[in-house]
């Protein structure tokens, strides 16, 4: 039994390392999406056409993999599953699509990333309300998850609202290739009216609600439909359908559907294959293995990644407030992850201590047999359950179980 517990712990440790590495890579992938999506919109790519191309490319990447790799895992497709996939697409693809609002508010890519750092708190509340996340307020692990979530959101808020003195650029780009790809960032439409800024903030907060709902809803769907790639494929498919319906009303000019430059092609390919196809697949795997709160709590790391990438690629200034916020985010992330790890550890210990025999009468007979055999000089069976008392009640000594093998010899 001890070897089984150790084996479970080793598997848990190796999987936990994979989950952390996957989530870190995922946040840097999304950070790159903030950069290239800003470039795409400033190059003139339609804010309706862009997500259509993005999700078509993602479907082209994930669809064949799901079809061939999950033939045996994929349950029968029913109307109930189709409705759930449609709702996932409505929240995760259409509802949370930041592209529709980037034209208004994405003057500094760090802002769009930072305002989304309310996602951990919203996801935590949703998951707790739906009982997908256990919160033991009276225990250390529960308090650590609550305090860590607040710290992550607070750190992201500091990065957004407090700049502080500037710090030297991490690296100032001087390559002509970089300038040619991202010269559209220095467009003339970077000054926004206050009403547009406010509208954009409200829209982004609505997207955060949709993003949190998407993360939380995937967990119960995966329990009934365990084929992860297939769920992602159906989500992208319905997302394409929904955006095509939107485009039929708001983007009727065929000229906007054309790709005019290599820069536009690069941004669309990155958004489709990296920020959608690969990212969605990694994210749903992490949700399945780590839970929705585990995935959401990594969201503030995206703010740090965007700030670093914006400083490297765009030459944006890095401020002291960003350092303070990043430290607070890291502390909060550690607290949440420690809380979840402690919760699993306590769960394993509780499961180990609560192991009971399946058939209680058989165990009663087994205990009596142990005593009778011991009285005859035979070594008792040492494979009894851990839940049996070490000192048996003396009343069992008077129990006489008739058995041919135990009859006294004349």
Swiss-Prot record:
Residues 38-47, 96-109, 163-196, 251-264, 314-317 are extracellular. The keyword Iron-sulfur does not apply. One of its GO terms (biological process) is auxin-activated signaling pathway. Keywords: Glycoprotein, Membrane, Transmembrane, Transmembrane helix. Residues 209-338 form the EamA domain. Its main location: membrane. The chain crosses the membrane at residues 17-37, 48-68, 75-95, 110-130, 142-162, 197-217, 230-250, 265-285, 293-313, 318-338. Disulfide bonds: none annotated. It holds the Pfam family EamA. Residues 1-16, 69-74, 131-141, 218-229, 286-292, 339-410 are cytoplasmic. GO terms for molecular function: transmembrane transporter activity. GO terms for cellular component: cell cortex; cytoplasm; plasma membrane. Induction: By auxin in hypocotyls, root and stems but not in cotyledons and needles. To a greater degree in juvenile than mature shoots. Glycans are attached at residue 196. InterPro entries: EamA_dom (IPR000620), WAT1-related (IPR030184). It is found in: Membrane. This is Auxin-induced protein 5NG4. It comes from Pinus taeda.
């Amino acid at each position: 039994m001890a070897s089984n517990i150790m084996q479970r712990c080793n598997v848990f440790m190796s999987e936990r390392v994979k989950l952390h590495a996957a989530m870190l890579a995922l946040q840097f992938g999304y950070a790159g999406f903030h950069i290239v999506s800003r470039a795409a919109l400033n190059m003139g790519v339609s804010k309706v056409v862009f997500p259509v191309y993005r999700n078509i490319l993602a479907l082209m990447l994930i669809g064949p993999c799901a079809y061939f790799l999950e033939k045996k895992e994929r349950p029968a497709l029913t109307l109930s599953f189709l409705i759930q996939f449609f709702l996932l697409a409505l929240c995760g693809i259409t509802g949370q699509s930041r592209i529709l609002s980037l034209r208004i508010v994405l003057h500094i890519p760090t802002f769009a990333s930072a305002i989304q750092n309310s996602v951990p708190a919203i996801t935590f509340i949703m998951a707790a309300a739906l009982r997908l996340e256990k919160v033991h307020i009276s225990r250390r692990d529960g308090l650590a998850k609550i305090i860590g979530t607040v710290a992550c959101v607070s750190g992201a808020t500091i990065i957004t609202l407090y700049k502080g003195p500037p710090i030297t650029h991490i690296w100032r780009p001087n390559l002509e290739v970089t300038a040619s790809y991202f010269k559209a960032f220095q467009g003339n439409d970077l000054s926004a009216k206050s009403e547009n800024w406010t509208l954009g903030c409200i829209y982004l907060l609505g997207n955060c609600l949709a993003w949190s709902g998407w993360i939380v809803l995937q967990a119960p769907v995966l329990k009934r439909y365990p084929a992860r790639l297939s769920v992602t494929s159906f989500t992208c498919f319905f997302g394409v359908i929904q955006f095509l319906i939107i485009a039929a009303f708001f983007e009727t000019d065929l000229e906007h559907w054309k790709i005019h430059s290599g820069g536009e092609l690069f941004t669309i390919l990155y958004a489709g294959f990296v920020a959608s196809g690969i990212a969605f697949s990694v994210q749903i795997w992490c949700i399945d293995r780590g839970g929705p709160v585990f995935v959401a709590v990594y969201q503030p790391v995206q703010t740090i990644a965007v700030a670093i990438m914006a400083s490297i690629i765009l030459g944006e200034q890095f401020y002291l407030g960003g350092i303070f916020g990043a430290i607070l985010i890291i502390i909060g992330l550690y607290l949440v992850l420690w809380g979840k790890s402690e919760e699993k550890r306590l769960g394993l210990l509780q499961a180990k201590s609560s192991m009971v025999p399946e058939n209680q009468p058989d165990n009663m007979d087994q205990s009596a047999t142990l005593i009778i055999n011991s009285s005859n000089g035979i070594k008792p069976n040492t494979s009894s359950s851990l839940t049996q008392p070490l000192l048996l009640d003396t009343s069992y000594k008077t129990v006489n179980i008739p058995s041919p093998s135990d009859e006294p010899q004349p």
